[in-house]
Amino acid sequence: MFVRRFSLRDFRSWDSLTLDLTPGTTVFLGSNGHGKTNVLESLGYLSTLSSHRVSTDAPMIRSGSASAFAGATVVNNGRELTIDVELIEGKSNRARINQSPTRRPREVLGILQSVMFAPEDLSLVRGDPGDRRRYLDELLTSRIPRMAAVRADYDKVLRQRSALLKTAGAALRRGSRGGESDNVLSTLEVWDGHLAAHGAQLLAGRLELVHDLAPHLAESYRSIAPESRPASIRYKSSLGSSLDPEFTDPARISGIDDVAYLEERFHLELAQMRSKEIDRGVCLVGPHRDDLELVLGDSPAKGFASHGESWSFALSLRLAGFALLRADGSDPVLMLDDVFAELDRRRRRALATVAATAEQVLITAAVPEDVPDELEAAKFGVEASDTGDGRISRIVPVGSTDQEVEFDD
């Protein structure tokens, strides 16, 4: 698939832009702070409904504006769809497909599949479990868009149950008055059922994803660092001893009864952790507490991998995701944000080899020399200037290209 055209309005430093793209490689060149990363961020947002840089939408709305707009026309196997999302300060976002409003923004998920590799990805190896959970869930919803609804339902139940745990703890500390404690505990059992039902679906999806991803990860790491220890991944579940260890083995093939089994195990672990959860007032069981274990040889990558090995593992995770989506039947758009300058010659060559096979690659770089020579690319310059309306970015064709740039009044 490829993005044929995309548009921005009041998205970070871009006040208004419409840009036509073609398959192949396109490079956005500009100094740091001039807005080139914002271009990839906008397309990444259309793909995942999240930013690789910030955890909330507000920073993506240009200062002084009430909303931001990002839209793209995507061509996939000859079929063309246009999607757009409006980020509205203090309100729910709105989305459209071919100019028809959707009931929920998440309905656009899956139309634009992308994989982005950025300097922030080092946190996949060195950061908290939440970074790796997010990696899994974004890849999962890209493959299976309906999983976004499962995740949203799980998060909603988790918030409700967490609030109830705090209430239960307070009620039990006061002692039972008029059956208050019994009522709270009965209500908690109901929410246990909801959490187990949605959590089992999400957990089953993640486990299947790790099974499918593992061989691509091993191969990607081997191609990037052939002299290093072999790389592997394994899912670490908070269900603990309630879950058969076989279920987290990446070699295990998922079965049709997995969700039912996981829901049963979920209930068992919740019952065992009930007192501890009430005492602490937090939910200690579920996919929100899980992790993706990254292993080099027999050692965890976090804390044991060198800087170079950490970069190789982070890059391998992204390339494995790219290979998996491609194996599913469609080339995702590959986006590389200022990463070639961070890599040594071998890793640059390995990344360039994969990029050369992608249907569309979008790259940001500070100078042309940061981009490997083997990637023949159309190039655009990105410049920003300070105005009375704040810092505004503009894009200017450089070199030989027949692509069209439109600046709206």
Swiss-Prot record:
Keywords: ATP-binding, Cytoplasm, DNA damage, DNA repair, DNA replication, DNA-binding, Nucleotide-binding, SOS response. Gene3D superfamilies: P-loop containing nucleotide triphosphate hydrolases, RecF/RecN/SMC, N-terminal domain. InterPro entries: DNA-binding_RecF, DNA-binding_RecF_CS, P-loop_NTPase, RecF/RecN/SMC_N, RecF_2. The keyword Metal-binding does not apply. It is found in: Cytoplasm. Disulfide bonds: none annotated. The keyword Glycoprotein does not apply. GO terms for molecular function: ATP binding; single-stranded DNA binding. It holds the Pfam family SMC_N. It comes from the Bacteria. Signal peptide: none annotated. GO terms for cellular component: cytoplasm. SUPFAM superfamilies: P-loop containing nucleoside triphosphate hydrolases. ATP binds at residues 30-37. One of its GO terms (biological process) is SOS response. HAMAP family: RecF. The RecF protein is involved in DNA metabolism; it is required for DNA replication and normal SOS inducibility. RecF binds preferentially to single-stranded, linear DNA. It also seems to bind ATP. NCBIfam families: recf. Belongs to the RecF family. This is DNA replication and repair protein RecF. The lineage of its organism: Bacteria, Bacillati, Actinomycetota, Actinomycetes, Mycobacteriales.
